[in-house]
Amino acid sequence: MTPTLLSAFWTYTLITAMTPGPNNILALSSATSHGFRQSTRVLAGMSLGFLIVMLLCAGISFSLAVIDPAAVHLLSWAGAAYIVWLAWKIATSPTKEDGLQTKPISFWASFALQFVNVKIILYGVTALSTFVLPQTQALSWVVGVSVLLAMIGTFGNVCWALAGHLFQRLFRQYGRQLNIVLALLLVYCAVRIFY
């Protein structure tokens, strides 16, 4: 990879990993509501699911030049529906001030989110088809970069969770408002899938 292409790769992957999306918003919400330690299951589920999705993206990108538009469209609708459901769960979740103790979303729910998370699927397919496959078609490189993409995504999730933990007091004081803003951001993510 040339220095210019490498620079573009890092810019794309870091910006994509650090911008709001279903994973980052869920990580922030979970750490704000339950603390960083109790959110580790959520982060672990996201990380494992992210890695598997990146490896699947590698397989798809490696074997197909163009993804069937009908499959992408169906996946987009499924992803949008799940994201809107997640937004509803966050918007209606009780805050500490409500006096109810709730558990963070489960490992398996955060794991399952990855398979309908259009943002990370497009992230993986775009990074691989734009930056890797034009340079090399060595399977080891494609798989290696897929693992790197998952690590970069996990880094973004952890950063958002740490922000939720560090600003927990402030977020708890304005918990209801934060939940509504996060839910609206998720709805925005769902709408952006189509526009």
Swiss-Prot record:
Residues 1-7, 68-69, 126-141, 195 are periplasmic. It is found in: Cell inner membrane. GO terms for molecular function: amino acid transmembrane transporter activity. It is a multi-pass membrane protein. Pfam families: LysE. The chain crosses the membrane at residues 8-28, 47-67, 70-90, 105-125, 142-162, 177-194. One of its GO terms (cellular component) is plasma membrane. InterPro entries: LeuE-type. It catalyses: O-acetyl-L-serine(in) = O-acetyl-L-serine(out); L-cysteine(in) = L-cysteine(out). It comes from the Bacteria. GO terms for biological process: cysteine export across plasma membrane. Residues 29-46, 91-104, 163-176 are cytoplasmic. Keywords: Amino-acid transport, Cell inner membrane, Cell membrane, Membrane, Transmembrane, Transmembrane helix, Transport. Its main location: membrane. Exporter of O-acetylserine (OAS) and cysteine. Belongs to the Rht family. This is Cysteine/O-acetylserine efflux protein. The gene is eamB.
